[in-house]
Amino acid sequence: MTCVTGGFYDEKCYFEISGHACRENDGEYGMPTELDGGEPLACAAVSVLVMTALEKVRALDSDGAFSSASVTVEPGYACFDLETREEYADEVRHAFEFILLGFELLEENYPECVSVA
């Protein structure tokens, strides 16, 4: 199960994505051997959303949007802890609201794989 938590607090943006949308198979997390329960789709979609968020943060960071930015992305875990400059606050909020919408749609369609708190 992938769990998504976080939100916006003034100019602060914090999101944490943890866990795997796929069950464990043969000692490793990854693509299940059978297409059951939508797991392969949910797993791939979670990966795409995390990588999209990462690329958006990189682009915004190169524009000087953050006064501080801490980003961790590793297998089964991603954390975005961003302090946004006031003039970029709306752009950052809209970007992460869009990505959060993607996670909410996954939760709606694959509740056994994704949870948004």
Question: What feature does the model see in each segment?
Answer:
Residues 44:
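A short, polar/charged loop-to-alpha-helix boundary motif
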Residues 1-41, 55-117:
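N-terminal intrinsically disordered, cationic/polar leader segments
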Residues 47-56:
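Conserved ATP-binding N-box helix of the HATPase_c
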